[in-house]
């Protein structure tokens, strides 16, 4: 599917289908001035459809009408935009996704014109439509025996905004990164495991000319990564510590690290998860790694002047005679000792060594991403990501990037008093604290493994997965927060 901006008006456009946006009206809508010429060209059909369907432009309402065989346009889509005062780039993106869903199963539509109000600027409008169309179209059918035919739609023309190649390229790259992340998360643990995840990243590195260093188990032992290897001990599959690097041409403006939790399956270990959805969903526990490498794909395409290190300590958390037990003591690569009082709080153990490794690279900021705690979902629900940071400037930069991305974040406290709950009588700390404030104590645990570098922790346990098709998301992995990470790097 090709998306392009155009200076052409709706009145002059010709193709299979055209989508026209209308703001909500409490009274009967009339054809706006900018569409009267098109309505005349279509013999008044726009006004007729509005009257016959009592279309009032309510948000989420979409009317599709097939026109006569002699009409210059074959299908007319009237799209409700809701309250004009609430129109913004996020609403535009959602609107484009709704249009994509409305037309993707229609084999008669190969060309689509979009006449929608500008949101902020013409460039932002082009980017938002691009994101909405690509993500609204996306379905992951890789594992079905009968494949659906691809959508017939070949070209989308955004009318009245002029040529916007840079904005459309940005939106396209963001979507490709999101979709890569979604497919990693959606793949079950017999498809994506530490070995195949590393192979996928190796292919990514080869495609984009990125540097790649994969530390094998012996390398991790030599580096003293006892925390990571404690989690990996029970699995029959070898752990893979993945370090992917994007370097710009010339001197980089900045050097940062993105660290993603990479548990390709989490049984809970000896603190085994209960049967049912809790354990069945644990293929998604590498959502942080998926977002990390999805961001890498987009950044490699966009080529910013920032050096970025993408890191994930990838393993499974399984059960065997070799596995870590409740009460075991692990030693992380910074020398700190950890009493394991819950084998199902394993993600932070893998992140501990990954954060130590990242800081040794001499980066100016570290952001970790993890499906870390159910406590964060209890606090913020499944739409909002928890953000913790020891640096106000970094926290603000991520918040600003999230606004550009349209992904929801909420900054949470790093309450030092709560570290009391992590204290151990026999080690430097335990890996879990009391039930209360569980997402905060998890962040405080991670903070112990970053000494002097600005650091932020993103708990994506809620928004990493969607239970239904909604907005730009399809059921399954969401690719959250690839777009925020990319906007942060670009800024």
Curated annotation (Swiss-Prot):
One of its GO terms (biological process) is proteolysis. It is an enzyme of class 3 (hydrolase). GO terms for cellular component: cytoplasm. Mn(2+) 2 binds at residues 261, 266, 285, 346. Binds 2 manganese ions per subunit. Its cofactor is Mn(2+). It catalyses: Release of an N-terminal amino acid, Xaa-|-Yaa-, in which Xaa is preferably Leu, but may be other amino acids including Pro although not Arg or Lys, and Yaa may be Pro. Amino acid amides and methyl esters are also readily hydrolyzed, but rates on arylamides are exceedingly low; Release of an N-terminal amino acid, preferentially leucine, but not glutamic or aspartic acids. The active site is at residues 273, 348. The keyword Hydrolase applies. Signal peptide: none annotated. It is found in: Cytoplasm. Keywords: Aminopeptidase, Cytoplasm, Hydrolase, Manganese, Metal-binding, Protease. GO terms for molecular function: manganese ion binding; metalloaminopeptidase activity. Its EC number is 3.4.11.1, 3.4.11.10. It comes from the Bacteria. InterPro entries: Leucine_aapep/pepB (IPR011356), Macro_dom-like (IPR043472), Peptidase_M17_C (IPR000819), Peptidase_M17_leu_NH2_pept (IPR023042), Peptidase_M17_N (IPR008283). Its main location: cytoplasm. The keyword Manganese applies. Belongs to the peptidase M17 family. Presumably involved in the processing and regular turnover of intracellular proteins. Catalyzes the removal of unsubstituted N-terminal amino acids from various peptides. This is Probable cytosol aminopeptidase. It comes from Picosynechococcus sp. (strain ATCC 27264 / PCC 7002 / PR-6) (Agmenellum quadruplicatum). The gene is pepA.
């Amino acid at each position: 599917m090709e998306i392009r901006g155009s200076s052409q008006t709706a009145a002059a456009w010709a193709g299979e289908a055209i989508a026209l946006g209308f703001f909500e009206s409490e009274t009967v809508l009339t054809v706006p001035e900018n569409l009267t010429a098109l309505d005349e060209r279509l013999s008044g059909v726009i006004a007729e459809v509005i009257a016959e369907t009592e279309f009032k432009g309510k948000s989420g309402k979409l009317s599709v009408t097939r026109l006569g065989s002699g009409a210059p346009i074959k299908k007319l889509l009237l799209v409700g935009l809701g309250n004009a005062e609430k129109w913004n780039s996020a609403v535009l993106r959602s609107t484009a996704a709704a249009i994509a869903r409305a037309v993707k199963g229609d084999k008669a539509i190969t060309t689509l014109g979009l006449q929608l109000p500008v949101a902020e600027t013409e460039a932002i409008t082009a980017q938002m439509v691009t994101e909405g169309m690509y993500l609204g179209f996306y379905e992951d059918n890789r594992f079905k025996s009968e494949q659906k035919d691809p959508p017939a739609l070949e070209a989308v023309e955004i009318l009245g905004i002029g040529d916007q190649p840079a904005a459309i390229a940005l939106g396209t790259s963001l979507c490709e990164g999101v979709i890569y992340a979604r497919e990693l998360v959606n793949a079950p643990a017999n498809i994506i495991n530490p070995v195949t995840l590393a192979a996928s990243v190796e292919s990514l590195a080869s495609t984009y000319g990125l540097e790649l260093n994969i530390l094998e188990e012996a390398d991790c032992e030599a580096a003293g990564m006892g925390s990571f290897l404690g989690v990996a001990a029970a699995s029959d599959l070898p752990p893979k510590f993945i370090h992917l690097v994007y370097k710009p041409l010339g001197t980089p403006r900045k050097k940062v690290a993105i660290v993603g939790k990479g548990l390709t399956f989490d049984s809970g270990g000896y603190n085994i998860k209960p049967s049912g959805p809790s354990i069945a969903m644990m293929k998604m526990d590498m959502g942080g790694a998926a977002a990390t490498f999805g961001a890498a794909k987009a950044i490699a395409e966009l080529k910013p002047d920032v050096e970025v290190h993408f890191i994930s300590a990838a393993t499974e958390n399984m059960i065997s005679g070799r596995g870590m037990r409740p009460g075991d003591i692990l030693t992380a690569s910074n020398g700190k000792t950890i009493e394991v009082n819950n084998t199902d709080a394993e993600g932070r153990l893998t992140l501990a060594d990954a954060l130590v490794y990242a800081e040794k690279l001499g980066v100016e900021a570290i952001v970790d991403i993890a499906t870390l705690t159910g406590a964060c979902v209890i606090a913020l629900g499944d739409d909002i990501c928890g953000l913790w940071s020891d640096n106000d400037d970094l926290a603000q930069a991520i918040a600003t990037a999230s606004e550009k991305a349209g992904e929801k974040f909420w900054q949470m406290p790093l309450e030092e008093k709560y570290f009391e709950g992590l204290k151990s009588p026999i080690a430097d700390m335990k890996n879990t604290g009391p039930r209360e404030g569980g997402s905060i104590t998890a962040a405080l645990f991670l903070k112990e493994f970053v000494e002097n570098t600005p650091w932020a922790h993103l708990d994506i346990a809620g928004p990493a997965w969607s239970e239904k098709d909604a907005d730009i998301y399809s059921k399954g992995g969401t690719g959250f927060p690839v777009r925020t990470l990319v906007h942060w790097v670009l800024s």
